[in-house]
Amino acid sequence: MNRTAWKSAEELSLLLGEAGRVSVFSCGICANLSGTGGARGMRNLSRLLKKWGKEVVCKECLIACCPLEIMRQAVEKNGKALRQSDALVVISCAAGVKSAFLARPGVPVVPAVDSVGSVPVATYEDDPVSRSRCTNCGRCVLAFTGGICPVNECPAGMKYGPCPRFEEEEGDLCALDPSRECIWKEVERRGDLAKLGRLKELHSRKGLERLPLPPRRNTPRPVRKVAGWLTVHAGWFARFIPLID
């Protein structure tokens, strides 16, 4: 899932500016599992906005914010409220925020959270596999790092192998930051550094082509509208999603 984190109160206040009446759309999946979105996040943000003297015109928890058709349906469904609003606050990752812009709600779109990386839906926060967030580098190495993202976890940002001081250091402490363990020691235990080196050579080749995508089927507009309507009106299911974590 795409992990999100709340923006600071100062930044959110700056983004809202002079908007006195706002509508709030909240994502029921990724942001919900991050603890920022869903019905609970929507209520928490609404309380804060009211504390700031803002009037919350409408609140809508969508099953997901990133699909454009769902966002379009939500904008259409809440058209009257949006026309009475000065801004649309979106509790979603960047994909949902972009969908809101594309849906043209007629008011400024204000993201309430920041996208901070891709993580598994898991409660094992003490494990580096779930702790290391994807940086969307475009060339994933998880297959040979035991599921740990070294770009995120290594202070030196090393991707295909440890820093030159790796062999010099005794014990498991990081050469750059002795207050933490060297993540490459853990990668060495769980992964395969030799194959990681071969992957580096492969990734460095110019003209390396990705597998082609299958031909995109054009879903008929009426089918998209029905699917969008169903998902917009199924937002109440979002209250159950945090229970899987």
PLM regions and their residue ranges:
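N-terminal glycine-rich "phosphate-gripper" loop used for MgATP/nucleotide binding
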Residues: V90-A94
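Ligand-binding beta-strand-loop-alpha-helix segment within the catalytic cores
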Residues: I63-M71
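Short, well-ordered alpha-helical microsegments
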Residues: G96-S99
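Iron-sulfur (Fe-S) cluster-binding modules
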Residues: M1-I63, V75-L88, L102-S118, A122-C140, ...
